C-alpha cells in the first residue's frame, strides 16, 4: 500500500522521517518528498506548511504526483476536551472547520455545497483504534481553523459551536476537504501537545517539543 503522510512543520516532519527505512528524497515543484518503508508499506512523506491553504496545496500536489492509496495528516494539536492529556492521540472520526460561516442556509462550519463534517475513512479509523500501545487513542471530532488557539475564551467559543470537539488544529479540515473532492481515503491522527486555556499553556507546548515529541510520533 502507498500511504501519503502530510505534516505542517519541520519538527513534525523530522519525527516521522526518523521512522522510515530505505529513504529516498524527491523534489517536485515547490515540495520535497521523502519516500520510505514501514511494515511493507510505501510511505510518501511531505511537509505542507502551516494553515489551511498550505495544507490544501500540499495535499493536491501529493495526490497529483504520487496517487497514494490513502492520506494521513499527522502532527500536533491542542486538546479541547477534559478527557485529553498531553501526549494522548486523537484519530478523526470526523472533521469540521471552526472558522467558516457561509451565511443563512448553511450550518456553521460548512462550506456551501460541501458536507459540514468530513468523515475519517472507517477502515483507517478502525486501524487507528486497534493499535495497542501505552498511548491513549481517542476517536472523535477535530476542529480546524486558521488560528493557533491559546486562551479560554477562544476555546469556549469553539466548544459552544461544537461541544463534541476533542482537538483543534490548522490543517486537518482542508486536507480532509481535498481528499473528499479527490476521493482519497483520509484520516487525521493528531498528538496532543497542549491544552488551550490552561494556565501553563505555552509551557505545555514547549515542554512537549523539548521532552516528549520523540516518544509520541511512533504511534502514527
Task: Indicate where each model-derived feature is located.
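Proline-aspartate-enriched helix->loop->beta-strand connector
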Residues: 67-72
Amino acid at each position: 500500500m502507498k500511504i501519503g503522510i502530510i505534516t505542517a512543520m519541520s519538527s513534525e516532519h523530522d519525527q516521522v522521517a526518523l521512522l522510515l527505512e530505505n529513504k529516498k528524497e524527491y523534489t517536485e515543484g515547490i515540495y520535497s518528498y521523502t519516500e520510505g518503508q514501514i511494515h511493507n508499506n510505501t510511505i510518501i512523506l511531505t511537509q505542507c506548511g502551516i494553515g489551511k491553504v498550505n495544507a490544501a496545496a500540499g495535499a493536491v500536489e501529493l495526490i497529483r504526483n504520487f496517487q497514494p492509496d490513502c492520506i494521513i495528516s499527522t502532527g500536533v494539536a491542542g486538546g479541547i476536551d477534559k478527557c485529553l492529556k498531553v501526549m494522548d492521540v486523537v484519530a478523526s472520526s470526523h472533521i469540521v472547520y471552526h472558522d467558516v460561516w457561509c451565511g443563512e442556509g448553511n450550518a456553521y462550519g460548512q462550506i456551501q455545497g460541501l458536507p459540514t463534517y468530513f468523515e475519517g475513512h472507517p477502515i483507517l479509523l478502525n486501524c487507528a483504534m486497534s493499535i495497542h500501545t501505552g498511548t491513549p487513542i481517542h476517536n472523535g471530532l477535530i476542529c480546524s481553523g486558521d488560528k493557533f488557539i491559546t486562551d479560554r475564551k477562544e476555546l469556549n467559543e469553539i466548544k459552544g459551536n461544537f461541544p463534541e470537539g476533542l482537538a483543534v488544529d490548522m490543517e486537518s479540515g482542508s486536507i480532509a476537504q481535498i481528499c473528499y473532492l479527490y476521493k482519497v481515503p483520509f484520516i487525521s491522527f493528531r498528538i496532543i501537545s497542549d491544552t488551550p486555556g490552561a494556565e501553563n499553556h505555552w509551557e505545555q507546548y514547549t515542554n512537549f517539543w523539548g521532552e516528549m515529541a520523540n516518544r509520541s510520533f511512533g504511534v502514527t
